[in-house]
Amino acid sequence: CCGNIGGGGFMTIHLADGKDLFINFRETAPAAASADMYLDKEGKLIKDASLYGYLASGVPGTVKGLDYALEKYGTMSRQQVMEPAIKLAREGFVLTRADTDVLDTT
């Protein structure tokens, strides 16, 4: 599906009736984006402007995409789906050594 709520993704769904669906909820360009936003005053391409810096950002689509899939094809309420994560956020959880090893960047 996706990597995190700050990005976007794709989802394939196989329904009980055998129908297969594909949902694209990748990041989208901001509303103020324009066709010439990566060009300098002379109309030449600004190197790497689409890769780095504030002009390279997109509007995340993950939350909208997951919500769309749940609303259109789901069988549970948003509350039911989110309850386990809400419980973990409220009560916390113990990390295993394997968890901390993955998170260790030193």
Q: Model-derived features: where do they sit?
A:
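Noncatalytic scaffold domains of N-terminal-nucleophile
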Residues: 1-106
